[in-house]
Swiss-Prot record:
This is Glutamyl-tRNA(Gln) amidotransferase subunit A. The lineage of its organism: Bacteria, Bacillati, Cyanobacteriota, Cyanophyceae, Synechococcales. Gene3D superfamilies: Amidase signature (AS) domain. PANTHER family: GLUTAMYL-TRNA(GLN) AMIDOTRANSFERASE SUBUNIT A (PTHR11895:SF151), TRANSAMIDASE (PTHR11895). The active site is at 74 (charge relay system), 149 (charge relay system), 173 (acyl-ester intermediate). The keyword ATP-binding applies. SUPFAM superfamilies: Amidase signature (AS) enzymes. The keyword Protein biosynthesis applies. Keywords: ATP-binding, Ligase, Nucleotide-binding, Protein biosynthesis. InterPro entries: Amidase, Amidase_CS, Amidase_dom, AS_sf, GatA. It catalyses: L-glutamyl-tRNA(Gln) + L-glutamine + ATP + H2O = L-glutaminyl-tRNA(Gln) + L-glutamate + ADP + phosphate + H(+). Belongs to the amidase family. GatA subfamily.
Amino acid sequence: MNFNSFRKEIKSGNASVKELINEFFLKIDSLDPKINAYTCLTKEIANSQSEQIDKLISNNEQLPPLAGIPIAIKDNICTKGVVTSCSSKMLQDFVSPYESTVSGKLWSSGGIFLGKTNLDEFAMGSSTETSVFGTTSNPWDTKRVPGGSSGGSAASVAAGLCAASIGSDTGGSIRQPASFCGVVGLKPTYGRVSRWGLIAFASSLDQIGPITNTVSDAAEILYSMSGKDPLDSTCLDKPVPNYLSDLDKSIKGLKIGIIEECFNHPGLDQEVKLSVLSAVDRLKSLGAEIHDVKCPRFNDGIATYYVIAPCEASANLARYDGVKYGYRSDGDTNLVEMISKSRAEGFGNEVQRRILIGTYALSAGYSDAYYKKAQRVRTLIRKDFDSAFDKVDVLLTPTCPTTAFLKGDFINDPLSMYLSDLLTVPANLAGLPAISIPCGFDKKGLPIGLQLIGNVLEEHRILNVANIFEKDADVMKRKPSIEI
């Protein structure tokens, strides 16, 4: 259900907001045992928030912009008084004493908090298979993964278990699962949205963003949660435009760049390639000018990312030692042994792997060869984007090289798993806004996503193109069929 449909239900007066929200909880109770999108539900909070909106309605008072909209939050974003676990044994019992800036803004805007969604442990993964709460299933085929790390967020929207979900994107963790689950996923410009209350993975790459059923819903959520935050020094002090105002603007004459390196990559599935190229033809028919552009270092992004991100993760996760923060092992005779056992038992294999990679790349004698070199390549990738945006307004790629893969296919093959992020990590390295929208289906009936990348703070541009395509292509009408 998109926002407008939900608002019509509220306006009709056939049911109160509280009754409509309880219908969502009934659906979650029925379907989520098969999907496993949620790590916990917040029924008491949702009922209290719903009653407040119902009171405003009964008093004919002005409603906040997201009044009554049911929203789920990824379980690495702090929500006051609710467990924020990062889907890890390390934080399984951590109850946040404060509200993240993003969730606080959403509740102030009238959103209703349904619960927390599943993710790869500490947001490190592309399949939501490394969670301490178990694997999340893709609503289009429950034998397949939903993507990751925001797999629970994407699956909850696709399955109709919320109207919107909030995820985090470090190397594609909003866009890749959005592509796999056939929904809209938006990663804003780095600094557009506050990271206060987001449990850090890689601080120079992390960004919070929405996953929704439609582009206009994503625009609404982005507007509500954007803006300067004194609690986050990396948050940009720039005016927040009304992202809805340009959604229906004609794209006639808009220059869209097709990144050649993406479409020529040997790992790109042919069905994905043909579907995205068909979408390019549709955009051309709608008046856009299509140009081939080169980003020579685009495909170097994945190697660059998997040096920088683990380095930052190894520093960010050093605090979890069982002393001040995180799971603490029992029965140890000394402090060193306790810390060692707590981290070994509290972190899963993938998190430990990335900590080891990062620690090695930052160690004496190796930081020049790995970390500093990766940062130089990151700068070159950003310069490639700058050159491309001198010629075009928006860049277009497939979101992922493939559609959703089967559970277990790559869990023991990390290098193959990492390639799922091949086409999404460059936007994070450059701090650029990017959106994934559905553009078709493969022969197995699995969703295919296309990615639009904009220049810094040009979310309005990619939202405009995405909305025009969405309305013309009408891909979103097709929904997964889930048996209870």
